[in-house]
């Protein structure tokens, strides 16, 4: 695989030189030396527990689908850039992917020996039903020496395979891409086969649905000789693992030839496509669909390498628009490969993992920029319509400009930059619907393609809207019956169907509740035996609206819950007394003349559970200036503002730089557990811990 010009710089920036055992802001990092893999030193690092993925793989089956698949290999500036900050960072312009419905497997790649995916990618990919692999790579002379040591004996090969399997299992990702890009002594090839075979065996035992994929590089003769197709020189490795990632300099006939050699396993052949276009069929970049179309015709799988090209080369007009445009090429060639959600509860606030503000139930908690891909919720399957201002534009917004500004200058900027700055209902995103709509017309657009098999238990649909009085927004649900008959139901605050001659469907009127400036709609229904197959937005005007006018509405969230499942859910919120919370590594260091800096690691757990069912926690801090310092007691009248510090996805959070003024006697930390359906308890009933500063000595390092 190619090494970009930015790799050396990126690697030096990615993992700072620090003592990985000493407490510090949690980071993700690779393992660079074989000895470190052997010694298991990763598990001794302060950062280990923060790097665990906690979101389970949310699909009905652990197996890959029996069809041509899409693998996406990350490769972005050498890896470990903004995504290395496990608790997030302040660069809202960091690289992100949100087109998960167009892929089956995501590989995190760098040129370090053992590339461990940052948990943000695994959390988000699993939420969308996508498997995540790390990368084991050896290259050049150093790689040859590494292989010589690793493959010295059969037992050594097995031991290193077990180390890799242990890492994947402990950290919650789904396997490895094995890339040996150097020569190997031919007499060690049997041990290389044992390494691959044993890795697959151990991984499959510990992680159902795990994958080991071989990269087309070294051959069974020990030569580094890229084949670009499945041949007798690389097939022996293919036979031992779950798939092969073919090098990307293949010719037009190679996909079909590879499919013939693979036989029944042709879907396990992933033909590489370099998005930068370095020797790839069709040239990659904006003509990537040429290669994708050919692979689809030949009924083999695709491996898209380095989609970060859009970001790294600053494709115009801006990253968000260019990213949507580029991935629309993939969709046109390959179609939608992921249908989600497949399990309940279903919830999305359209958060893309970055933004300019954070809101909670309509109330803005922060107006600071942020980046944390773990926070990405289920992404809508919006269709990309370039330069078409004659219809309502539908965009996911993370920026928050005033979308209700109808001045000509603002409208031009809105369409050019695809950004509206309105606070969100939850998180940092929403969907903006904006354009011209006649009074007697309606507009629909796809949001999600679920595959939810429903029972006799009622389901509740809720969604939040912010709009002016002339713009209405409903949710259109499409169902399939056991006999494959289709049925659609409109969930809306009123029944507009009688006004539209071309529509014949049932309307379910919602109950309405106002939360801040948002209107929350809710309705329940029973669709026993049916399958929910599509969720769409339905835009229309109130009755008696006749003229064409500007339509604008924000969709803040949408959720679908099962009544019975909700009552039996282990994530039913528990009182603070059901938890234990502790402070570790507490340290007070000098700040400026009138302040100090508090550093502390917070850890919590449910008393009766070994592993928490929660995958998200809001962490707050509150300065205490009173003399009431009784632990585990929330002040009825806080002496200062409660501040959101961040969001944790494991039951731990490291507070690295909390500035406390000289008159602050203690800091109360509060942790608010959040359910998968975004349910959460009251903050004043959350588990909490008081850290008394008066008994702490100031550490001057």
UniProtKB/Swiss-Prot annotation:
This is Cytosolic endo-beta-N-acetylglucosaminidase 2. Optimum pH is 6.0-7.0. GO terms for cellular component: cytoplasm; cytosol. Disruption phenotype: No visible phenotype under normal growth conditions, but the double mutants engase85A and engase85B accumulate very high level of free N-glycans carrying two GlcNAc at the reducing end, but their counterparts with a single GlcNAc are completely absent. Its EC number is 3.2.1.96. Belongs to the glycosyl hydrolase 85 family. InterPro entries: ENGase, Glyco_hydro_85, Glycoside_hydrolase_SF. Gene3D superfamilies: Galactose-binding domain-like, Glycosidases. It catalyses: an N(4)-(oligosaccharide-(1->3)-[oligosaccharide-(1->6)]-beta-D-Man-(1->4)-beta-D-GlcNAc-(1->4)-alpha-D-GlcNAc)-L-asparaginyl-[protein] + H2O = an oligosaccharide-(1->3)-[oligosaccharide-(1->6)]-beta-D-Man-(1->4)-D-GlcNAc + N(4)-(N-acetyl-beta-D-glucosaminyl)-L-asparaginyl-[protein]. Pfam families: Glyco_hydro_85. GO terms for biological process: N-glycan processing; protein deglycosylation. GO terms for molecular function: mannosyl-glycoprotein endo-beta-N-acetylglucosaminidase activity. It is found in: Cytoplasm, Cytosol. Its main location: cytoplasm. CDD domains: GH85_ENGase. Endoglycosidase that releases N-glycans from glycoproteins by cleaving the beta-1,4-glycosidic bond in the N,N'-diacetylchitobiose core. Involved in the production of high-mannose type N-glycans during plant development and fruit maturation. Keywords: Cytoplasm, Glycosidase, Hydrolase. It comes from the Eukaryota.
